Amino acid sequence: MRALLVVDVQNDFCPGGALAVPKGDRVVPVINELMADFELVLASKDWHPEGSVHFDNWPKHCLKNSEGAEFHPDLNIEKIDRVFLKGTKDKDDGYSAFEATNRDLADYLNKKDVTEIYISGLATEYCVKETALDAAKKGFDVYIVKEAVAGIDEDDVEAAFEEMKEVGVQFVSAEEV
């Protein structure tokens, strides 16, 4: 079975948010269309506590229960089967969806007999990359849907693509899904 994983498509990572990815909102319609092609759609959220050490390196963003931590308003959340919260502890950065603290993502995927993970979301060179690397390490076939991800810095995005390719992550267009 295959699953679509939507990484951190939250208000604070979209234009106008506290840690916005330029044009991050452009992934939303692509992701909404992709959802129709999957039986299983999962999502991750950054969900930081006020005193998180994560904010030593980043502006405050995605504070738990805040408007900034909510999914982008145009994202079709009715199609999302489960949400995995990450970065929930004071000393937890939580870049990868596999670092979720409310549920074990790998265990959940294995129980659902998922072998292929298609990843979408924000930001390519941070949470998308770390999620893809962890998924590959855990033995899943990993695909990044190119039109369904967005990053902050083009050079860093290219370096992230190379790092992901080195561990077998594949890149596909939305049409190929």
Where in this protein do the model-derived segments appear?
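Histidine-anchored nucleotide/phosphate-binding helix
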Residues: I31-L34, K129-K137
